[in-house]
């Protein structure tokens, strides 16, 4: 009897875990007065340049906000930060009409599918060079050709660039 009960509990537990994994990720949130950068504790509306938001497992309504793309990458690599990341969104700079205020018409894209222009000299929201995310590879390549820099994917982002 105990073995049967344990088997039934195990089946339900595994089923619940599988359902949680198969649920769609949370949708990106728009930047508001309550969007505060994880590292700088400043309101994101006060900064220009691309932004990022990370949703952790079990917290679908509470994104972790980032004032820069480099900060977001740092968060994913630093050992002291949470690793239960559900989804990451970044600003699609290919669809921004006002680069001095990308918050006004932000389109969010999956960070792992984005193309990043690095080493372009672009100064982000915290006054330092930052990566520029694009949802379209051709737009990223055109930007890099016109303004300088190179295009990399999420998994190819060099640690030396993130932490310099």
Features from the language model and the residues they span:
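Positively charged n-region of N-terminal signal peptides that target proteins for export
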Residues: 1-4
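C-terminal motif of bacterial Sec signal peptides marking the signal peptidase cleavage site
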Residues: 13-16
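Bacterial signal peptide processing site
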Residues: 18-20
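Short cysteine-rich clusters marking metal-coordination/redox-active sites
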Residues: 37
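Cys/His-coordinated zinc-binding microdomains
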Residues: 41
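Short, non-ligating residues that shape and space the ligands of small metal-coordination modules
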Residues: 46-49
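Mid-length scaffold segments of soluble, non-membrane domains
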Residues: 62-102, 107
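Beta-strand-rich cores of mature extracytoplasmic or soluble domains
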Residues: 100-149, 154
């Amino acid at each position: 009897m105990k073995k049967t009960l344990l088997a039934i509990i195990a089946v339900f537990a595994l089923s619940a875990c599988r359902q949680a994994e198969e649920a769609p990720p949370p949708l990106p949130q728009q930047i508001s007065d309550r969007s505060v950068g994880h590292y700088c504790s400043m309101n994101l509306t006060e900064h220009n340049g691309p932004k990022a938001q990370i949703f952790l497992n079990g917290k679908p309504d509470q994104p972790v906000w980032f004032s820069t793309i480099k900060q977001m990458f740092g968060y994913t690599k630093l050992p002291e930060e949470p690793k239960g990341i559900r989804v990451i969104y970044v600003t699609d700079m290919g669809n921004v009409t006002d680069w001095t205020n990308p918050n006004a018409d932000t389109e969010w894209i999956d960070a792992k599918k984005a193309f990043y222009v690095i080493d372009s000299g672009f100064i982000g929201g915290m006054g330092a060079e930052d990566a520029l995310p694009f949802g379209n590879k051709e737009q990223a390549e055109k930007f890099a050709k016109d303004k300088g820099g190179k295009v990399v994917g999420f998994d190819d982002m060099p640690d030396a660039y993130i932490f310099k």
